[in-house]
């Protein structure tokens, strides 16, 4: 009897974390591509964001860059919840209570300057030891996203233009 109980405890301890992960990534299956840039949110699960508004609408994006675009475009809506992919676990966490890292040597998603969220401050500090950057809160990360918006948008346009030109060259 003791062995059955121990086996049951072991099975549950292995199954429960796995079940939690599939539930926290359900947002990806509901909205696979970013509303603004079309990028695959599953590929960018470590930076993806979800914004739930008080009117019952929600938006799924690939990054804080695209979240900033949505928040600016929906100035008359009030966000009820803003979630972001934890850089370490890829699970959605509350963006406003997360510890953020701005900058460092790892380029951002849709941005030259990275902006990464962590549920645990010590994981953010470990990231900084390996990659550089500075600790920040959500407000500072969002401010950085808006500050970077012009140069990032210009960079994205230039990259897409170069891609289109390469595609045209290959057609001829």
What are these regions (language model features)?
Residues 7-15:
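Bacterial N-terminal signal peptides
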């Amino acid at each position: 009897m003791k062995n059955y109980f121990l086996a049951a405890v072991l099975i549950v301890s292995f199954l429960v974390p796995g079940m939690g992960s599939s539930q926290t990534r359900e947002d990806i299956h509901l909205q696979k591509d970013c509303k603004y840039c079309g990028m695959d949110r599953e590929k960018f699960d470590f930076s993806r964001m979800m914004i739930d508004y008080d009117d019952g609408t929600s938006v799924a994006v690939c990054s804080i860059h695209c979240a900033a675009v949505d928040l600016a475009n929906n100035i008359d809506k009030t966000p009820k919840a803003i979630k972001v992919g934890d850089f370490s676990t890829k699970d959605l966490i509350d963006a406003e209570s997360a510890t953020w890292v701005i900058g460092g040597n790892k380029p951002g998603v849709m941005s030259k300057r990275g902006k990464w969220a962590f549920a645990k401050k010590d994981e953010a500090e470990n990231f900084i030891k390996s990659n550089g950057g500075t600790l920040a809160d959500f407000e500072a990360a969002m401010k950085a996203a808006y500050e970077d918006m012009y140069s990032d948008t210009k960079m994205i346009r230039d990259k897409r233009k170069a891609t289109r030109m390469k595609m045209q060259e290959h057609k001829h």
